[in-house]
From Swiss-Prot:
Keyword match tRNA-binding: no
InterPro entries: Ribosomal_eS1, Ribosomal_eS1_CS, Ribosomal_eS1_euk
Main location per the UniProt record: cytoplasm
Designated name of the protein: Small ribosomal subunit protein eS1
Amino acid sequence: MAVGKNKRLTKGGKKGAKKKIVDPFSKKDWYDVKAPAMFNIRNIGKTLVSRTQGTRIASDGLKGRVFEVSLADLQNDEVAFRKFKLISEDVQGKNCLTNFHGMDLTRDKMCSMVKKWQTMIEAHVDVKTTDGYLLRLFCVGFTKKRTNQIRKTSYAQHQQVRQIRKKMMEIMTREVQTNDLKEVVNKLIPDSVGKDIEKACQSIYPLHDVYVRKVKMLKKPKFELGKLMELHGEGGGSSAAKPSGDDTGAKVDRADGYEPPIQETV
């Protein structure tokens, strides 16, 4: 072994001695998460992010965050099996402005619907809204006994399943194709699409538990601040839904240099 100085000893002091413990939360800030105006409860919670430091800007860390919220919390309701995904698209002051990003049913609800002695029918379709959002909708329905039926099972024939699936796809395409994202979300909240499918398929085979079980966001148009502000009731138009109830969030401040979109008709 070569003779020389031991570098560890000459540095002095114990290894890792007196390391200053810094609380990580002292460098972070809380931001309010705001839901769009389609929902009754606007203030859905808070999120944490590191403060702006050098080139790392806090608002960039918040954009793109996805929040999963139960519809019961958004509507102050008891029906809690539907979950909505909201994505943070812009930051105004201490508020994160979110937009619709997807919908899902809870696992326990899906499991409770699947039973013996009935046929499960599923369908999915890719549809584009009038304002350029490409959505993938998944639908599920189950056959039920006819009135005065004695037989235990209620299985649909393969031809009937195909007819019902075709009807599901037609109704989902029609409901989304002719509306913008805001109107589509307004239909997903009470699940009027599922009720329409159930009514339309009665002549083929009686159904129950028909739901749009999942909505995926596949493609979005280019981000426009004006449209997002309209969703949050700041567009200046009367079309923005006004939230009701005492638990509604405060109005969001306008961005610096924000101008409302020019209206075609007055």
